[in-house]
């Protein structure tokens, strides 16, 4: 993995992203999903995780956020953050690109037209100080 400066050392953002994807995979596997593929990359976008459950193919994008809850005594919502939701980063243009990547995956992998599929989003909140994460799955997002 290379960062913008062509160094082999991953950036902090890349490290958080990798931790988030690993947490998402662990969460999905514990909940009965079978990991089929990871990091399917095209020049127009990427699918972080492809899973299968109940004969349905699920394309999962992971958004990871590093948060510091060390001084927090009261959490006001389930995600631990009132002002920012990572899923807000899913802009219409990004969804359009994801749709194209999914279509590419279906063609590249010769997936039958009869196969049901959906797009899901996993948000991962990572507290590096406490070495904890919170994972949330948003299912069947319309592209």
Regions found by a protein language model. Name each.
Residues 1-38:
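Acidic-basic catalytic patches of nuclease active cores, encompassing PD-(D/E)XK
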Residues 28, 105-106:
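Hydrophobic recognition helices of helix-based DNA-binding modules
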Residues 42-45:
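Short acidic/glycine-enriched loop/turn segments that link adjacent beta-strands
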Residues 52, 73, 80, 112-113, ...:
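Positively charged, solvent-exposed patches that mediate nucleic-acid binding
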Residues 67-102, 108:
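Mg2+/Mn2+-dependent nuclease catalytic core
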Residues 107-143:
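Domain-level recognition of nuclease-like catalytic cores that cleave nucleotide substrates
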């Amino acid at each position: 993995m290379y960062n913008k400066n062509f160094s082999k050392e991953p950036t902090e953002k890349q490290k958080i992203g990798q931790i988030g994807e690993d947490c998402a995979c662990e969460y999905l596997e514990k909940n009965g999903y079978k990991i089929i593929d990871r990091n399917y990359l095209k020049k127009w976008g990427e699918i972080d995780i492809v899973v299968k459950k109940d004969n349905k193919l699920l394309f999962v994008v992971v958004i990871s956020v590093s948060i510091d809850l060390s001084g927090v005594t009261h959490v006001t919502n389930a995600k631990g953050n009132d002002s920012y939701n990572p899923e807000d980063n899913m802009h219409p243009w990004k969804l359009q690109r994801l749709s194209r990547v999914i279509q590419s995956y279906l063609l590249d992998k010769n997936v039958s037209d009869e196969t049901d599929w959906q797009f899901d989003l996993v948000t991962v909140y990572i507290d590096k100080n406490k070495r904890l994460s919170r994972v949330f799955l948003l299912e069947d997002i319309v592209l």
